[in-house]
Amino acid sequence: AENTVSFDFSKFLSGQENLILQGDTVTDDSNRCLVLTRENNGRPVQDSVGRVLYQTPIHLWDKQIDKEASFETSFTFFIYRENINRGGDGITFFLAPTDTQPKSGGGYLGIFKDAESNETVVAVEFDTFSNRWDPANSHIGINVNSVKSKITTPWGLKNDYFTVTITYDATRSLSVSSFYRNKPDDIFTVKASVHLRDALPQWVRIGLSAATGDLVEQHRLYSWSFKSVLPLDSST
């Protein structure tokens, strides 16, 4: 026996079931995507935070039977900048308590309150602006309870569709593999050993977040799929 949650959004349209839009996120029906941070006539604005959550909570681990879920998620986004060298602040995939609400914008990416506090969240960040706690350039990072990434890898920005796959397995390895549509052989990877049950409650919600600060860019989400499996019997 197992407890499974799975979904596959190949596009986003108004009134899509099982999604919770938070902050500034809206649906763009003509482009069949989610516009994560606010735009005025297609131009991104400062100090915006937007998020989308999957409505059904995920059973991440079970204390009684001492089991942890494994999962895989994939999504495609497009970060557009008029000037490729100037913008902010990025997109994250995150797992958080089921009552999670948007936090601070800018470099906090809608999932952290500030630089000091411990947040009940695990995230993969696609960070497009180097804050004081960040490496020097745009990067992909794995964050466990803190805005300061546990591990990062450099990531060059292009105005192109970017596809990400994140897996978490029974060996407690969280790994990220990602590429631009026009350069599919150029793969950005990062992985870390993460014990999710030490960082998160047994039930979580999953989502994607984005934020702008003083600098801006478009953050648009075009597809998102997910599957988690929690073994329920103690034999497996």
From Swiss-Prot:
Gene Ontology molecular function, alphabetical: D-mannose binding
One Pfam family named in its UniProt record: Lectin_legB
The keyword Glycoprotein is assigned to this record: yes
InterPro entries cross-referenced by the UniProt entry: ConA-like_dom_sf, L-lectin, Lectin_LegA_CS, Lectin_legB_Mn/Ca_BS, Legume_lectin_dom, Leguminous_Lectin
Record-linked PROSITE patterns: LECTIN_LEGUME_ALPHA (PS00308), LECTIN_LEGUME_BETA (PS00307)
S-S pairs: none
Lineage top rank: taxon: Eukaryota
Keyword Magnesium assigned: no
Signal peptide bounds: none
Keywords: Glycoprotein, Lectin, Mannose-binding
Glycosylation sites: N118
SUPFAM superfamilies according to UniProt: Concanavalin A-like lectins/glucanases
Subunit structure: Homodimer of noncovalently associated chains.
Function in brief: D-mannose and D-glucose specific lectin.
Family the UniProt entry places it in: Belongs to the leguminous lectin family.
Protein name: Lectin
